């Protein structure tokens, strides 16, 4: 599987998807992206942006899709049977996991491997564009 990424650009506060990611320069620690503008359904113009690694957040695709066929990325917030959960990478287990939002504030939050329940998930946002979903309702 070829890794697929999306990038949150802190400057400009915009999500860049892999189709618009032109280059990842590991030596200079920067990426080059494009924003394509369409007119009448056809590409009309584009802007090119360069971001330092310090100004972006990489999010890798899990390779899985939610119940509506939407690709699930690290950092996504999902609805799972009426509870919100956030998707994270667990380095020790080399696996994507989900943690319920209402457990994030606990000292020891429970987590589960993503592959066990992803087919019940519905992606409802992500930690950058919809951070309010990470707030615990009391």
Q: What do the PLM-derived regions correspond to, one by one?
A:
Residues 1-138:
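Secondary-structure transition motif
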């Amino acid at each position: 599987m070829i890794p697929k990424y999306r990038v949150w650009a802190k400057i400009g506060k915009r999500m860049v998807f892999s189709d618009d990611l032109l280059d990842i320069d590991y030596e200079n620690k920067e990426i080059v992206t494009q924003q394509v503008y369409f007119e009448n359904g056809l590409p009309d113009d584009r802007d090119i942006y360069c971001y330092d690694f310090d100004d972006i957040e990489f999010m890798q695709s899990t390779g899985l899709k939610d119940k509506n066929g939407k690709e699930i990325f690290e950092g996504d917030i999902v609805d799972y049977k009426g509870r919100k959960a956030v998707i994270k990478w667990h380095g020790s287990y080399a696996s994507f996991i989900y943690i319920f939002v209402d457990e994030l504030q606990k000292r020891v939050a429970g987590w589960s491997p993503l592959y066990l329940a992803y087919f019940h998930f519905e992606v409802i946002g992500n930690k950058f564009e919809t951070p309010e979903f990470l707030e615990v309702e009391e």
